[in-house]
Structures are given as structure tokens and as C-alpha cells.
UniProtKB/Swiss-Prot annotation:
GO terms of molecular function: 5S rRNA binding; structural constituent of ribosome
Pfam families named in the record: Ribosomal_L25p, Ribosomal_TL5_C
Keyword annotations: Ribonucleoprotein, Ribosomal protein, RNA-binding, rRNA-binding
Subunit structure: Part of the 50S ribosomal subunit; part of the 5S rRNA/L5/L18/L25 subcomplex. Contacts the 5S rRNA. Binds to the 5S rRNA independently of L5 and L18.
Descriptive protein name: Large ribosomal subunit protein bL25
Disulfide bond residue pairs: none
């Protein structure tokens, strides 16, 4: 389980000192809950994210175990390392907005016809309760030829999950190489 420490001060200088010591600055928030300013060891956080199998994962901060989902993250533009992450509390029975990743499976037949697979939407915005949150949208692209695409309306529908993206938005497609 990922363990973090509560930050006493939220000043810029203290955040910079924590980053220099190898910590990742984080905020945990939820509806009707007090915001928690905390920090995690950067390497431990990255290991935990690679090992998790669901979008919702537990963290321990200040002696409490919380179920959270990554809402946003920021990377350093030069070094490409994580510098900040926002974690949303996964509260049962409360509707929240989440971003669900898209996982592409298979090889498109359009790739043999000088096409290029183009993933235009990497995360789908949904509104649902935490217990109904899908782990990912898995899309099989084996039948896509040059000029074909899969739209939001073509994705599988989950019970009690409302997709917030427009139905006409392309998720993945095969475009002709120049």
C-alpha cells in the first residue's frame, strides 16, 4: 500500500524542498471532505501506479486508509518527471467525474495498407459513482482499415455510467500515411 505524509505547510519553498528530497506533492479531495495536503515518495508512487490493476487504489495518509483515483497530474516540462498529482476520493454512492483510460487491442488491417493508427482520445470523461467506475475502455482495432475510426458512440456501454464526451468524437482511427 502506498504511504504518504501530511504536509504541515503548503508554501512554495516547503514544496520545493520536498521535491528535492524525492517526494511527490499531492492533494486529496472529495465532495464534503476536507482537502488533505500530502507528499509521497516519488519512486514508491511510480511503483504503486505500475502495479495497480484498477483505477481505484488505496493510500495511507496520517494513519487513515483512503480509496482514491488519480484526477490530474503535472510533469516537469524539461525533465518529464512528476511534480504534482491530484487524487480524488472514491466515495461510494456519490456521483463524480472521472477520466477512464482507453486501451487499444489488436493490429489494424489498415496498417498493412500504408495506414497509421491514430489515438485521438486517450482518456474518456465519465460521470458515475465509484462502485460503477470501469477500469478501462478496451477497443479492438483489428477490423479498422484506412479511413475508418471508432467514435465515442461505438464504445461499449456500462450500467450507471454516463459518458460526458460528445458521441461524434473519434477515439481511435487509421489515417493514410503521407
Amino acid at each position: 500500500m502506498l504511504e504518504g505524509q501530511i504536509r504541515e505547510s503548503i508554501s512554495k519553498s516547503q514544496a520545493k524542498a520536498l521535491r528535492n528530497d524525492g517526494y511527490l506533492i499531492a492533494n486529496i479531495y472529495g465532495k464534503g471532505q476536507q482537502n488533505i495536503h500530502c507528499a509521497f515518495k516519488l519512486n514508491d508512487f511510480i511503483k504503486a501506479m505500475k502495479q495497480k490493476t484498477t483505477l481505484i487504489f488505496p493510500v495511507q495518509v496520517g494513519g487513515k486508509t483512503l480509496e482514491v483515483v488519480i484526477q490530474e497530474y503535472q510533469k516537469d516540462p524539461v525533465t518529464n518527471t512528476l511534480i504534482h498529482v491530484d487524487l480524488l476520493l472514491a466515495q461510494k454512492g456519490i456521483l463524480n467525474k472521472y477520466k477512464v483510460p482507453v486501451i487499444v487491442k489488436g493490429n489494424a488491417k489498415g496498417l498493412k495498407n500504408k495506414g497509421v493508427l491514430f489515438i485521438s482520445t486517450k482518456r474518456i470523461s465519465v460521470k458515475c459513482a465509484a462502485e460503477n467506475l470501469p477500469n478501462a475502455y478496451e477497443i479492438d482495432v483489428s477490423d479498422l482499415d484506412v479511413g475508418d475510426s471508432i467514435l465515442i458512440r461505438d464504445l461499449p456501454q456500462f450500467d450507471n455510467v454516463n459518458v460526458l464526451n460528445r458521441p461524434s468524437v473519434a477515439v481511435v482511427g487509421v489515417i493514410k500515411a503521407k
